[in-house]
């Protein structure tokens, strides 16, 4: 079984189907990224005592004792081993699709748009790590970057990085 962040669950399911892995995937609400102290309890509840692999990077959560994805952030599984780039706000397909709900409303910017510049003042650009590029997602990525007041760069990454990391966890 894989307990996955909702931001990764669709990708995990698609990879499992493509690879023929018979694995149940249970998703945990992605909004918990805004409240990382609640992630462990949600993972434990979803796991229900079963032996699980956790499709979360660190994400600010204490997931000690679980086999999980390496790295500090889920975008690292799509970005690969590239160095962190100061000033970059990373977007994944999930964040592009759900930007208004998860980021804009999730951070209260719908009620207090004046906070945008405080929250994002240290960012110089948005980078969309595109797993599956479509015209609809292109438009949504442009919308997200515009709301942040940042120029957009697109890097087509696919999901191979996530697939390699899942394989290491599930097939070891």
Placement of each model-derived feature along the sequence:
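Structural motif
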Residues: 4-7, 29, 56-58, 129-133
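N-terminal basic/disordered segments at the start of proteins
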Residues: 1-19
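Extended, histidine- and acidic-residue-enriched regions that form the cofactor-binding/catalytic faces
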Residues: 113-172
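Glycine-rich, highly charged phosphate/nucleotide-binding loops
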Residues: 36-48
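Active-site glycine-rich loop that binds ribose-phosphate moieties when present
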Residues: 41, 104-116
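Hydrophobic/aromatic-rich structural module bridging two neighboring secondary-structure elements via a short loop
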Residues: 46-76
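A short beta-strand-loop structural module common to alpha/beta enzyme folds
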Residues: 21-38, 154-156
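Long, charge-dense
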Residues: 64-105
């Amino acid at each position: 079984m894989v307990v996955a962040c909702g931001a990764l669950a669709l990708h995990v399911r698609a990879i499992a189907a493509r690879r023929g892995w018979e694995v149940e995937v249970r998703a945990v609400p992605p909004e918990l990224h805004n409240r990382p102290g609640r992630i462990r309890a949600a993972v434990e509840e979803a796991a229900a005592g079963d032996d699980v692999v956790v499709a979360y990077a660190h994400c600010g959560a204490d997931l000690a004792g679980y086999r999980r994805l390496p790295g500090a952030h889920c975008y690292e599984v799509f970005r690969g081993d590239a160095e962190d780039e100061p000033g970059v706000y990373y977007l994944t397909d999930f964040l592009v699709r759900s930007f208004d709900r998860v980021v804009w409303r999730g951070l209260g910017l719908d009620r207090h748009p004046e906070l945008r510049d405080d929250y994002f003042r240290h960012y110089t650009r948005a980078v969309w790590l595109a797993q599956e590029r479509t015209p609809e997602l292109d438009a949504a990525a442009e919308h997200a970057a515009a709301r942040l007041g940042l120029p957009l760069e697109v890097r087509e990454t696919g999901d191979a990085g996530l697939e390699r990391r899942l394989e290491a966890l599930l097939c070891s």
